[in-house]
Amino acid sequence: MGLRAGRLASPSRGVLQLLRLPLLLLLLLSSGARGAAAQGDTEVPTLYLWKTGPWGRCMGDDCGPGGIQTRAVWCAHVEGWTTLHTNCKQAVRPSNQQNCFKVCDWHKELYDWRLGTWDRCQPVISKSLEKSRECVKGEEGIQVREIMCIQKDKDIPAEDIICEYFEPKPLLEQACLIPCQKDCIVSEFSPWSECSRTCGSGLQHRTRHVVAPPQYGGSGCPNLTEFQVCQSNPCEEDESLYSLQVGPWSACSVPHTRQARQARRRGKNKEREKERGKAVKDPEARELIKKKRNRNRQNRQENRYWDIQIGYQTRDVTCLNRTGKSADLSFCQQERLPMTFQSCVITKECQVSEWLEWSPCSKTCHDVTSPTGTRVRTRTITQFPIGSEKECPALEEKEPCVSQGDGAVLCATYGWRTTEWTECHVDPLLSQQDKRRANQTALCGGGVQTREIYCIQTNDNMLSHGNTQKDKEASKPVDSKLCTGPVPNTTQLCHVPCPIECEVSPWSAWGPCTYENCNDQQGKKGFKLRKRRITNEPTGGSGATGNCPHLLEAIPCEEPSCYDWKSVRLGDCEPDNGKSCGPGTQVQEVVCINSDGEEVDRQLCRDAIFPIPVACDAPCPKDCVLSAWSSWSSCSHTCSGKTTEGKQTRARSILAYAGEEGGIRCPNISALQEVRSCNEHPCTVYHWQTGPWGQCIEDTSVSSFNTTTTWNGEASCSVGMQTRKVICVRVNVGQVGPKKCPESLRPETVRPCLLPCRKDCVVTPYSDWTPCPSSCREGDSGARKQSRQRVIIQLPANGGKECSDPLYEEKACEAPPTCHSYRWKTHKWRRCQLVPWSIQQDVPGAQEGCGPGRQARAITCRKQDGGQASIQECLQYAGPVPALTQACQIPCQDDCQFTSWSKFSSCNGDCGAVRTRKRAIVGKSKKKEKCKNSHLYPLIETQYCPCDKYNAQPVGNWSDCILPEGKAEVLLGMKVQGDSKECGQGYRYQAMACYDQNGRLVETSRCNSHGYIEEACIIPCPSDCKLSEWSNWSRCSKSCGSGVKVRSKWLREKPYNGGRPCPKLDHVNQAQVYEVVPCHSDCNQYIWVTEPWSVCKVTFVDMRDNCGEGVQTRKVRCMQNTADGPSEHVEDYLCDPEDMPLGSRECKLPCPEDCVISEWGPWTCALPCNPSGSRQRSADPIRQPADEGRACPDAVEKEPCSLNKNCYHYDYNVTDWSTCQLSEKAVCGNGIKTRMLDCVRSDGKSVDLKYCEELGLEKNWPMNTSCTVECPVNCQLSDWSSWSQCSQTCGLTGKMIRKRTVTQPFQGDGRPCPSLMEQSKPCPVKPCYRWQYGQWSPCQVQEAQCGEGTRTRNISCVVSDGSAEDFSKVVDEEFCANTELIIDGNKQIVLEETCTQPCPGDCYLNDWSSWSLCQLTCVNGEDLGFGGIQVRSRAVIIQELENQHLCPEQMLETKSCDDGQCYEYKWVASAWKGSSRTVWCQRSDGINVTGGCLVVSQPDTDRSCNPPCSQPHSYCSEMKTCRCEEGYTEVMSSNSTLEQCTLIPVVVIPTVEDKRGDVKTSRAVHPTQPSINPAGRGRTWFLQPFGPDGRLKTWVYGVAAGAFVLLVFIVSMIYLACKKPKKPQRRQNNRLKPLTLAYDGDADM
């Protein structure tokens, strides 16, 4: 209390000091004011004052004291504005600079806040005046604490500003809660005790115990005892009025004469030894005596730890009457009085030596994170406690310390290091289905790579200076437990580049016959060439264009030329000799072109043959008119051979027939067509064929700068050369001579390349050898080994140095010393020491030299081999110290003497047999009758023989299914990536328990069992989602322009058992996965080809002129378009039907001598299309009319431009992105999304891209973009940990656990992590042996009726199965031989204790009650956080009313506890019995208590009415008022008392069956108003809905249900009739409809 009061006083003093400051300031200001007033007559008050700003930051060169901080100081007017410094008094100017402490970051380790403990919660003064009538939760309070900044190493205060630099100052005060007052709560009374007297008048009592102590100022506990007078049968004899009482034993003391007697005895002994030494002259005898003395001296040295002294103690024996007053011993009639003396051991407290020096600090280095270590000092026991209950103080003391000296080295720091990543592997990402059907050799795309981690000492190079360069490159690994930081990732996603196949354009048309090199035209050898180009460069494989097909083909030809004239168009036909008609010529307009068809300078064609003019005929008015020749058709064959010959045709038609007179007649039909040969070159095509590039070989001609790579990655690689084979190949034949192919176009055969860098194997140095066991070996004969290892951090590559040395080495440890086990050696008991005869000689009946006494013995510490050992070793390893003293008996003449017990006889027979042991009476005891009493002194003891019947039975649940453990594969230090075995056949286990015939648990080996039942089990393997192969791509959805093509997969099998989930399925058809990509169809792939119009066939033939209106036709065919022009006829549906030219038309055949004009030219329409504009076409006159009066008509047609009819706009359109496209060999990773560019006409039709290109429209959209398909990474788990220690050291419920962790979470559609991350397995059943106290014996007072006595108890070895329900069963003590002697957690074994047997008439305290349940302080079931409390109590027992004034106070004891609960108290009432009932308070766990319930809310226990309810048909209600029974109404008086109960009238409803109006149904009508009968007759019902009991009949419910169904039916019909039916919708789907599968719609899909 003193300490607590002191703590409470200190903050109050601080508060007072804080309050003093403003008071002093007020006094100073008031005195200053008075002084100013006094001087007001002589001195004018100043109008200017000095003002100061806050102190700035502490500045200085060094950390710590010595810094300087400044602040601003200025002069200001009293109104606040700043003025000149000269206006203020300079003498009182404040300082603008002061010294300060400069805080640096490293001060954080030296300074910190010291937080004091919170003081007691004090009520807030302002709130305490407003206390409510009823406390609900508690009273608000406040508590304070002391906080100071300290220098940690010196433990001295420092300025607060230093600590505030790093952390704000913690709160000095906080709100707290003072709970409501809690009154004492007690239990119900126990039953009444028996009467205190067996006859006559006595007392009986009953007690109760405390359930909850008073808290927070609550009221105290009521009396825990009630007593009442009881009457028994009258006493036949006088009851004894006196009792013999023994007092407590005195303290153990040593007789006064002992020291003198010992001194005399020592003197005599020395004289005897001297004489004996003189007498003994034999050297051997002297040696024996010397050894014995040394041994005795050692024993005495060991025994000095105990220094046992045996003394004596006495007690008083008095005779008491019933009032507790002493009387003469003669009144207590007894044959033999109790002993008043006995031998005892002098109590010795534990004594220890002085502390030894502190050990060196465990932290010998400097560590910033944990700078402190520990140091230890010890002391030893110099005197062990004897007869004392106090334990020895601690023999070891630890305290934190810091390594001393400035030269302390840095502590070793550790960190994780990693090996290089392994190659990227795609196969771990494959599903089960892909692994079975895929060729895994050429996989690419997203993959997984792994690496190992190992721990190293990161500052090893700083701590050791003699490291070699190799050691610095790679540090040696250390134990992984030393690295505490986050573990680096051991798995990551990677990417294997996918090879991109070479894509080429279509072949161009065959070019003209040209030299292979126009710059070198030696010889006449020429070639016709056709080419194609690479549209998509290949990657991967052999690289560059090695995988591309040949890009050029050649055909030998004759008469090559590099340049030639090309006819552009023919001029008009000019008649000869200036005539207007007749034969003439047409001049060709030509340009000079090269072999690629490009227009060049005309000078280059100077060697070429210039085209000559073409002969023609300008028709005269009466001549036949023919149309111009059509263009030559495509060549029928690309080359000419023996069976094939290329041909081209062209045709013309008759436009007008000739007149009958003098005109040139039209030619026959054969003259209207011309045929010529084409592609006359032979069908022998040659090309250069290239082989793959060879291996890159170092080129010695290039200076080598290759170096071997090191771990730091600094390397350079040399240049090499690659070659490949190039041959000339004839198509469809094979290799031919190289002269057949154009030499100048031969591909290169050699190219430079970079040699891959050589990488040597890099291995860490060996780790240190693992430590051998430093402690001694206990029974483990297995050879101990130590090992070391190293880690490959870089695998060799490209011809680097291989890893050859072993990665793991081990060697045998040196044999550790064998552990010494220690034991206590007990020596012979010394002689039995009695109480000195000088003490007991005055006691009546005492006999000298016999009786009870006490004897001691020496104990020493020995090794198992018998060698000497320190007493400290046995105290630590040899178990409890044997008894040093024991009671002994020197038999007197009247005592019975027996031989020692014999050994037990052998067991013969089955279970249930017994064995015996015997003893016999010795000497004069044979003649004493009392010694022959077998009840007092049994001569035979029996015990049951051990029984060997055992039965085994399973206990507990089955374990998880456990797979057999496999071995981890390690290859050159790099872990192999692969799935570990997680499914298949395993075993599950159930523990077996073995019991003997008495139901006691024994070792399972007794039942010939290894402790388990094994049962095979199956862990189902996960099955991934299985889809079909991709279907073929559908046709492009559009035949012209950009469309889409689709392929799909169907669902074949759903995933189960944690397999990979299915990808996101189509929302329409849940059984399919679609992939959609854009596609492009060339609009000119198929074109309409027309032949010339036929001759106009006149409908009404004028035989004379053969002219007039008619019809002409032509053939229209759909043909496939190629680079060489239309090639072959195809089906018409492949061409666009909207663009199909007309096959017939009306025509007009001119009459002779009429004007003849040519075919109409193309329409001209300027773009962009202007609706206000027009377009036109024209034709040229071919034959002039004979009559000049009949001129040729205007050969121009005009029509307005109409958008989307004869004039169009064009624009680019971009399709949607495709799905992410991966390589066929890829599972995931980087891919490409593509889209197409489309040229769309304004009417929405896709047309050829050339229409948009001719307009020069912008096209800035990217057509490709990169994308990523998330990789399906399966969940990767660590290996199972080792099995943990059993959760229970014994019993049935022990479990072993092993765990695993997720090393790589699943990603994407990878296999998810299993839920089972922990497995349990039952432990083998072991019996639980422990020591257990027996019950205390009754308090035994030796040969007296009351007073101080003793009670004893035994300890026994018991076995149980560890469960709370199992009752422990006693077994032989040998089973507990290896069990430490601890009972209820206490090593101090108490088998005997003093007790008090109350004398008749005494008033005394009963035994302590059991500790109550742990109870928390709660409000509405919520803990307030004040901790739990338990209580026990002692009640007062009264035996005589006259002795009440001698009664002690009842006792209460509390203690704090942790596992508390919230309890509620509420009133409970029984059912009313008449006008009364019982009401009691009950706790929420069902215990009836007194106190705890609020008195104001206690229910009534009596409900009788006053005055009583005497009126007929009335009763007393719960509200204690008179009420009427049912069917009656109350009539109240003016003073609100019941006067009478009036019958309530009823309405009679007559029925058909009974015209007399029997009462069928009665209903009260306004029970508080008079009944009024309605006028008229009562209505008669033929169907009565109510039965005789007033309830509805069954048929009424049926009618109601039928009516409801009918109503629902009518409403439904109305709704269906009025509802407007939906129009059937026809869905159009251009996509190919796939074959559907049955699918059950599982949510996991």
Swiss-Prot record:
GO BP field: actin cytoskeleton organization; angiogenesis; cell differentiation
PROSITE patterns tied to this protein: TSP1
Domain notes: Sequence analysis combined with the expression of constructs corresponding each to two or three adjacent TSP type-1 domains suggests the presence of 21 TSP type-1 domains; not all of these are detected by standard bioinformatic tools.
Coiled-coil stretches: 256-304
InterPro entries: Spondin/Thrombospondin_T1 (IPR051418), TSP1_rpt (IPR000884), TSP1_rpt_sf (IPR036383), TSP1_spondin_dom (IPR044004), TSP1_TSH7A-B_C (IPR056991)
Record-linked Pfam families: TSP1_ADAMTS (PF19030), TSP1_spondin (PF19028), TSP1_TSH7A-B_C (PF23308), TSP_1 (PF00090)
Region (Disordered): 255-300
Residues of the signal peptide: 1-38
Keywords, in A-Z order: Angiogenesis, Cell membrane, Cell projection, Coiled coil, Differentiation, Disulfide bond, Glycoprotein, Membrane, Repeat, Secreted, Signal, Transmembrane, Transmembrane helix
Stretches of the chain found on the membrane's Extracellular side: 39-1595
Cytoplasmic-side segments: 1617-1645
Expression sites (tissue/organ): Detected on kidney podocytes along the glomerular capillary wall (at protein level).
Basic residues bias locations: 258-269, 289-298
Listed name of the protein: Thrombospondin type-1 domain-containing protein 7A
Composition skew (Basic and acidic residues), residue ranges: 270-288
Processing after translation: Proteolytic cleavage in the extracellular region generates a 210 kDa soluble form. Extensively N-glycosylated.
Glycosylation sites: N223, N321, N439, N489, N668, N706, N957, N1032, N1213, N1264, N1354, N1488, N1535
